[in-house]
Amino acid sequence: GYDPYSSSKGCADLLATSYRNSYFNINEYKKTHNTLLATCRAGNVIGGGDWAKDRLITDIMISVSQGKKVSIRNPKATRPWQHVLEPLSGYLQIGQKLLEEKVEFAEAWNFGPSDEGSITVEEVVQNVKKHWDKIDYEINQDPNQLHEANLLKLDCTKANTILKWKDVWDS
């Protein structure tokens, strides 16, 4: 990836794959080790309990509760938004397969929304505003702001075809 965020995701997967191949190779399962290692990646997860800094829904809630405008960094950026329960269902499927000792599932997996579920930051704000009219926002025009990719999406073809997993809720 061009920016540190997307590069960090790729690096994490590469590191996990390297670790799996070196120490928990599936060809050596039950011979030299008893560990199956899979990695799972989700889209931009929203849902209860996420109060981390620079999270869109969190920023909206905090700004409204303080009577402030929400500052939007990149309104035209498209993200793979999904409720926390969506990827969790995929994670549980992978966990079940690993518990069943199905070594072919010890790989990297993506769990994200369909292409139709990827909408812009501004569309998310507008959707929330439809249900909570107290929301007012402004576009952050900071010229020193760090680079962010305009489009993030996940290829979930493997999860869709092999696990028959798909997202249920729309954005």
For the regions a protein language model found, what residue spans apply to each?
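Short, flexible, glycine-rich and Lys/Arg-enriched loop motifs at helix boundaries
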Residues: 1, 23-28, 101-105, 114
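C-terminal substrate-binding subdomain of Rossmann-fold SDR/epimerase-dehydratase oxidoreductases
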Residues: 39, 44, 64-171
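Conserved protein kinase catalytic core
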Residues: 47
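Non-catalytic, surface-exposed connector residues within folded enzymatic/regulatory domains
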Residues: 31-34, 50, 54, 102-105, ...
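A generic local structural motif
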Residues: 26, 57-58, 137-139
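Active-site Tyr-X1-5-Lys
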Residues: 2-38, 64-66
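Short-chain dehydrogenase/reductase
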Residues: 1-14, 50, 54-58, 80-81, ...
